[in-house]
Amino acid sequence: MIITSIPDFSLQYDEPLGLLRVEWASGDDMRTFRDSAAKLLLLVRELGVRHMLLNMNTLPDISVYDQVWMGTRWMPHMAKSSLERLVLVIHRRRVHNQLAIDSLIAAARPLIHFDIQYFPQPGPGLHWLSDYSVRLPALLAEWEALHSPNAATPPSANERSPFYRAGH
């Protein structure tokens, strides 16, 4: 299910998997980042999200002020959420955000009770989060239909990942 309640984010939720996919959708405009991040936290709580993918590749460089806010206001609440697993998608060339995220996680590590994994692309991260669920191709198709310039034939919906195990 595509969620449109937070305009700064592209959001997709699958209730049976307890999986929320999150991507920044406002380009370089970070003026409403804090408000949207706070709304995201409320959504995670409201839905009882267990597995979340945050695509950090779509987020501009996080300012020092936003990093401090996240570390003091946002991370402590996220650490108390229902999350069991978190995937952070970040390309190795996104050094600024990689360092910012590493710093935030290090500071909040004593509070965090969920598994955190890094992936360079969303596909493998979604496979891991969903335990290679048979629901994943439909979720990928739904996402591609919304985000792909060629929505008629979503390429990744029918492709099997090298990590895919049939029957799960």
Region locations from a protein language model:
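Amphipathic, Lys/Arg-enriched alpha-helical "gate/interface" segment within cytosolic domains
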Residues: 1-168
